[in-house]
Amino acid sequence: MQLDIRSDRPDVLTKFKALASEPRIKILEYLANHFCNLTEIAEALEMNLATVTMHVNVLEQAGLIVCEHRPGERGTQRVCSCQFDWFNVHMVRMREADIGKLLEFPIRIGSYSDFQ
C-alpha cells in the first residue's frame, strides 16, 4: 500500500515534520516489518521507552502509523504498525494562467513585526 502526500494539502507539513527525524525514520523502518508494542520497539532500537512513546505519538498524529490498544499481560498495551510500503510526494504545480494572479507587495525591511 502507498501513501500519497500532496503539497497542496493542509496536513503536508505535519507529515514532513514527522519524517524529519532520524529516530522516527528508524521506528518507521522497524514497523514496516513488525507489528509490535512500544516496549518491543524500544528494546529493538535500543531507545528509551518515553522517547519511543513521544516519537510514536508524532508518527500516529501525522497518519504515518496506526496504533491500537490490545489486552496485555498487565492491562492494555499499545500495538503499532506501519500501513504503507511507499511514500509518494506529489508537488502541485501552478498553471500558467494562475501565475498572473499572484500579487506582489514590496515590504521594506523592518516594516513587519511577526514572521516564521
Model-identified regions with their sequence ranges:
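A short acidic, leucine-rich amphipathic alpha-helix
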Residues: I27, E40-E46
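Key DNA-contact positions within bacterial/archaeal DNA-binding proteins
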Residues: L49-A50, N57
